[in-house]
From Swiss-Prot:
Plays an important role in growth control. Its major role in stimulating body growth is to stimulate the liver and other tissues to secrete IGF1. It stimulates both the differentiation and proliferation of myoblasts. It also stimulates amino acid uptake and protein synthesis in muscle and other tissues. Keywords: Disulfide bond, Hormone, Metal-binding, Phosphoprotein, Secreted, Signal, Zinc. Zn(2+) binds at H46, E199. This is Somatotropin. It comes from Bos gaurus frontalis (Domestic gayal).
Amino acid sequence: MMAAGPRTSLLLAFALLCLPWTQVVGAFPAMSLSGLFANAVLRAQHLHQLAADTFKEFERTYIPEGQRYTIQNTQVAFCFSETIPAPTGKNEAQQKSDLELLRISLLLNQSWLGPLQFLSRVFTNSLVFGTSDRVYEKLKDLEEGILALMRELEDGTPRAGQILKQTYDKFDTNMRSDDALLKNYGLLSCFRKDLHKTETYLRVMKCRRFGEASCAF
């Protein structure tokens, strides 16, 4: 039988994950900075997993196995986020300040709000794709969490960040077109990569500030 302590912690984490940031911050104005970081990491981790699952399901359903490697090494797999000076891994992220990482995370997050707003109209035929109507809502929720952290660290309203010179296109609803399939495949690949970056940055910040035993990742 699971001990009461771990069970309570899991239930609390799940409850916080289900709360919108406005409730978390509004209902618990004295919430610690570590709590805000813990929430942000949970939400980013959940979104990253959802992005990875959706990508794998799309790949399995629409992209022949023999074509996957070739496609991933072509221009269709280029991500606009690569045009900004974002760290590519944990070691590079360690060289950036917390505010720099938060601004980059916010930029990555906001670059997907437009394309993902109507994602559910594209993917409707599986259990994984069936969750896509909630991705936009979860992304907006993570945006609020990042802004809340920036307000805490800046002790005020976050300054406007850099704007991507290019943004992601919307997903193509014409799934019978090869061009549309390749476009959507590339977008899902970029979404997965960008969410991995965001999760990595948030985890680096949380571990750096609070030195937890679980910082190895």
